Amino acid sequence: MSKEIALTLDSRKRLGSTYLKLTKPKVVALMLVTAIVGMSLAPVTDFPWIQASIGLIGIGLMAGSAAAFNHLIDRRIDARMARTHTRPLPSGDTNPLSVAIFAVAIGVVGFVLLYAWVNELTAWMTFLSLLGYAVVYTMYLKRATPQNIVIAGIAGAMPPLLGWTAVTGELHGNAWLLVMIIFIWTPPHFWALAIHRVEDYRKVDIPMLPVTHGIEYTKTSILLYTVLLTLVCVMPVLVGMVGFIYLFSALLLNAGFIYHAWKLKFAPEPNSAIETFKFSIYHLLALFVALLADHYIGMVLQ
């Protein structure tokens, strides 16, 4: 009897792990960090903790739903790529119908939470972001143009704005600046990975930039985008959102990103592309933590 219980528990753990993987939890976690920053920087006199918490849950569920739809739609090309062939669907850990039901279910729950307990604006904007990633990007742009990441990057850049609207119920230019940071960060982040996995993308006929325009062109594009990103990252300081702590951190982090991009272009080593990709993740996380730290330290010192 105890053996049967142990087997049942083990089976449930594996099932839970499978469905957690479908939501791309690390990606969603980073998105939620940026949403928290959007909430924290929003000008509210009495912070709505319960509303904000429900907002994070709703945004997280809908982001997880978009990720699950991505797994579902891309299952055939995932099976042929070295980076993705062990994902739940290609590996046979689950089936398309179950993934579709799961994606719809958590998406609906997330939307209802946002619509009923946060505000309609956040619910609909999060839904549009889901459509942008799962439908516009995954179903069309990814397979249609090498500018797929550039055009669809807005969908993945929305969490700071969603966090802002979750606690204020309104759009604001400062929140769009946070969106712009992620929007400009996205192409060099993904293009570095695309260089590292260029043969994978070529094999499945996905027109990523290094496949269509060549690796050297892509390296140049990455370097130019990191310079542009540095300029965009200064803008929150110029409008008075944050101060010196963030400015120093942003300049340091962007210098690191430019260094990796420069090295990738002019002094590449076998792992330069994947190292640039990995650094970009730490860059974005640290940048938004710096926004948060500057904001709260500034409040204490006032």
Curated annotation (Swiss-Prot):
Top-level EC class as recorded in UniProt: transferase
Segments crossing the lipid bilayer: 27-47, 49-69, 98-118, 121-141, 149-169, 175-195, 228-248, 281-301
MF terms (GO), sorted A to Z: protoheme IX farnesyltransferase activity
Annotated EC: 2.5.1.141
Keyword field: Cell inner membrane, Cell membrane, Heme biosynthesis, Membrane, Transferase, Transmembrane, Transmembrane helix
Pathway, per record: Porphyrin-containing compound metabolism; heme O biosynthesis; heme O from protoheme: step 1/1
Xref: Pfam families: UbiA (PF01040)
Gene Ontology CC: one annotated term: plasma membrane
Superkingdom as given in the UniProt entry: Bacteria
Localization per Swiss-Prot or TrEMBL: Cell inner membrane
Family annotation (InterPro entries): Protohaem_IX_farnesylTrfase, UbiA_prenyltransferase, UbiA_prenylTrfase_CS, UbiA_sf
One BP annotation, GO: heme O biosynthetic process
Function: Converts heme B (protoheme IX) to heme O by substitution of the vinyl group on carbon 2 of heme B porphyrin ring with a hydroxyethyl farnesyl side group.
Miscellaneous comment: Carbon 2 of the heme B porphyrin ring is defined according to the Fischer nomenclature.
HAMAP family noted in UniProt: CyoE_CtaB
Stated family: Belongs to the UbiA prenyltransferase family. Protoheme IX farnesyltransferase subfamily.
Name this protein carries in UniProt: Protoheme IX farnesyltransferase 1
Taxonomic classification: Bacteria, Pseudomonadati, Pseudomonadota, Gammaproteobacteria, Vibrionales
Gene responsible for this protein: cyoE1
